[in-house]
Amino acid sequence: MKSMNRMKVIRRITTLVMLFIIIFCFAVTGFDMNVIINRGSQAVLFIKRMFPPDTGYCGKVIEPLIKTVQMSIAGTFIGAVFGLFTAFLYAGNLIKKSYVRIVVRVIVQCVRTIPVLILALVATFIWGLGAAAGTIAIAVSTWAVMARIGGEDIEGLTLKPYEAVTAIGAGKFKAFSRTVIIELLPGYLSNSLYVLEANIRHAAILGYVGAGGIGLLLNEKISWREYSRVGMILVMLFVAVLVIEGISIFLKAYLDGRIKRNTTANVIISVCIMVFFVYSLSAVKDVSTSKLGIKVVGAIMHGITHPDWEYMFMTGKSGVMYL
């Protein structure tokens, strides 16, 4: 009876604390529902200006839209491949040396906390403006996400086949590729497709920081208030995302066995995927690092290893704690 009363008290205290945090956040951010209600008509007016879209502008949208899709596919593929092998080091049941696992997990978690837009901004400083920087940013972001997902999936697997192969003298990496990857791959590929769907949407805004794709065109037309062309860009982007998600749903159903599989279908799908990937690599064909880019990397690493702790504990509006 006492334990039940104690739980009720804890739940009430937790509810009150959460309400206090929510109210505090509203107060600090200056959230005002009246502003949203009073200016809601502006949002409706903005949408009305976009429709009907300027269909004559369709031809100008195709090239940057294709570039956006290329960035997404190439970045997701590269990130997923590297993430698969990083998952081997991330998983606690495969790597017995705790310091290796801890270092890998810290790096992965640190990268995961950085939004892909910030990664793209940093990439433009290093590799210059264009789709190459966007592709690299998506690849790094995907690598971190898939390394964690893959590592956690590995921890949920039974490792008896892996242990049996290592027991007969095979190396850990060989045993991993012959046993764990085979069992892990269907679920890993399905998760990669989910990440690809998200990356298509991420890639659409990377142009705002000069990382190529349709975002650059979208930013330009919004700035010039050419709303009918903005509408055309959004319609074509919606269609592209819809097509990619349709293909993704089909491939996930194929991997899950909901669609009948055979050798011919496996070969055709594998060839199509490789063709799309090779074609998408044209998005990074001009990647190069200048001397300035190397200096930027050095400056970034110096900033990471020598943080300004005073900025961390500043109480003003420019301090990290307030932001």
PLM segments and residue spans:
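Hydrophobic alpha-helical transmembrane segments of polytopic membrane proteins
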Residues: 214-251
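N-terminal, non-cleaved signal-anchor transmembrane helix
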Residues: 1-73, 77, 246-323
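Cytoplasmic-entry segments and transmembrane alpha-helices of multi-pass inner-membrane transporters
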Residues: 85-120, 149
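Generic hydrophobic transmembrane alpha-helix motif, especially the helices
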Residues: 108-142
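Hydrophobic positions within alpha-helical transmembrane segments of bacterial inner-membrane proteins
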Residues: 76-88, 92, 117, 187, ...
